[in-house]
UniProtKB/Swiss-Prot annotation:
GO terms for cellular component: cytosol. This is Glutamate 5-kinase. Residues 276-354 form the PUA domain. It is found in: Cytoplasm. GO terms for molecular function: ATP binding; glutamate 5-kinase activity; RNA binding. The lineage of its organism: Bacteria, Bacillati, Cyanobacteriota, Cyanophyceae, Oscillatoriophycideae. Keywords: Amino-acid biosynthesis, ATP-binding, Cytoplasm, Kinase, Nucleotide-binding, Proline biosynthesis, Transferase. One of its GO terms (biological process) is L-proline biosynthetic process. The gene is proB. Belongs to the glutamate 5-kinase family. InterPro entries: AceGlu_kinase-like_sf (IPR036393), Asp/Glu/Uridylate_kinase (IPR001048), G5K_ProB (IPR041739), Glu/AcGlu_kinase (IPR001057), Glu_5kinase (IPR011529), Glu_5kinase/COase_Synthase (IPR005715), Glutamate_5-kinase_CS (IPR019797), PUA (IPR002478). Pfam families: AA_kinase, PUA. Gene3D superfamilies: Acetylglutamate kinase-like, PUA domain. PROSITE patterns: GLUTAMATE_5_KINASE, PUA. It catalyses: L-glutamate + ATP = L-glutamyl 5-phosphate + ADP.
Length: 373
């Protein structure tokens, strides 16, 4: 069976830190590595940051813009140059590429999500390496990915990848930032049971040009491993290490995946959608859902948070506010607020009409990875 690899490279690796100009030697090494993987029989996707950083360099700007409109304009300048460089380098090796620009909107809508999957499948059939970036030019703030670490994990989930490599400016995960704390301990392997107890001073900031930091990489690892994808953090200046890692060398930090048991639709619910609110449940409802595999009934709901409509995604939380599941609701928030705590037989009396007996049917409900661990 053909294996699929997603490789994400960050702005700090793609560009020279002093100037923001493209680090062409690094990009050339990356292109050569990805082409070797493709020739070896892998299906390869590259998630590339850098549009804003390259745009800043092209326009001789010293700082990343904070204004949304300016950021989107500069991304439009940088994306064209970035994809041209990739195309020129891949073309010298005879490897065709495609550009795919995504926003969260494409993953929220089920039909668009399936269309995106089919597009990737067709590109693989054509022998093409897709290059993915967030469509910064049109993404609205509440529907953006926020960083390409998250985007790469969601893409890996979408296409059912086997591996996700995050190429960054450190060689692996450490207990603290090794650039600031010389005694920081390297972490080479993380299994699912250890993930929840991982002690890492991750911080929140990335490089001056990027948007990610180690916090976003750990969030990406949670998405990827929960979806059955093995993830690796390794240094981006040596992309050839990807080949060595695939051959079994202990380079970087590897995150062992959980078994991929959920169907494609449930993975979409779990990772493709943005929760628009929360439902707080009593202990009986939590047990029925998490241990009994039951649907969510109105009687088990204690509190409603957020403003949402039917068919949107929400988080289900226990009495302490911890996420236990997420799913698609059959009622809007104002209706759930009226029927919470009541039996399903009373819905018609409370709302004036009889809708679904369940607030969330079990077919539209996914147990949280945190609750399973």
């Amino acid at each position: 069976m053909t294996k699929t690899i997603v490789v994400k490279i960050g702005t700090s690796t793609l560009t020279e830190p002093e100037t923001g100009q493209l680090a062409l030697s690094t990009i050339a090494a990356l292109v050569e590595t990805l082409t070797k993987l493709k020739t070896s029989g892998y299906q390869v996707v590259l998630v590339s940051s850098g549009a804003v950083g390259v745009g800043c360099g092209r326009l001789s700007r010293k700082e990343r813009p904070k204004d949304i409109a300016m950021k989107q304009a500069i991304a439009a300048v940088g994306q064209g140059r970035l994809i041209r460089v990739y195309d020129d380098l891949f073309n010298t090796l005879g490897q065709p590429i495609a550009q795919i620009l995504l926003t969260r909107r494409e993953l929220i809508d089920r039909r668009s999500y399936v269309n995106a999957y089919n597009t990737f499948a067709a590109l693989f059939e054509l022998g093409v390496i897709p290059i993915v970036n967030e469509n910064d030019t049109v993404a609205v703030e509440e529907l953006n990915f926020g960083d390409n670490d998250t985007l790469s994990a969601l893409v890996a989930n979408l296409i059912e990848a086997n591996w996700l490599f995050l190429l960054t400016d450190v060689d692996r995960l450490y207990s603290a930032d090794p650039r600031l704390v010389p005694t920081a301990q390297p972490i080479t392997f993380v299994n699912p049971s250890d993930f929840a107890h991982l002690q890492v001073e991750a911080g929140s900031g990335g490089s001056g040009w990027g948007t990610g930091g180690m916090t976003t990489k750990l969030a990406a690892a949670r998405i990827a491993t929960s979806a059955g994808v093995r993830m690796v953090i390794t240094h981006g200046r040596q992309p050839q290490n990807i080949l060595k890692i695939l051959e079994g060398e202990a380079i970087g930090t590897q995150f062992e995946p959980q078994p991929r048991t959920e169907n494609a639709r449930k993975r979409w619910i779990a990772y493709g959608l943005m929760p628009m609110g929360k439902l707080y449940l009593d202990e009986g409802a939590v047990k029925a859902i998490c241990q009994g595999g039951k649907s969510l009934l109105p009687a088990g709901i204690v509190r409603v948070e957020g403003d949402f409509v039917d068919s949107e995604a929400v988080l289900l939380c226990d009495g302490e506010g911890k996420e236990v599941a997420r799913g698609l609701v059959n009622y809007k928030s104002t209706e759930i607020d009226k029927i919470k705590g009541y039996r399903s037989a009373q819905i018609a009396l409370l709302l004036g009409y009889m809708g679904e007996e369940t607030v969330i049917h079990r077919d539209n409900l996914v147990i949280s990875e945190r609750k399973l661990s």
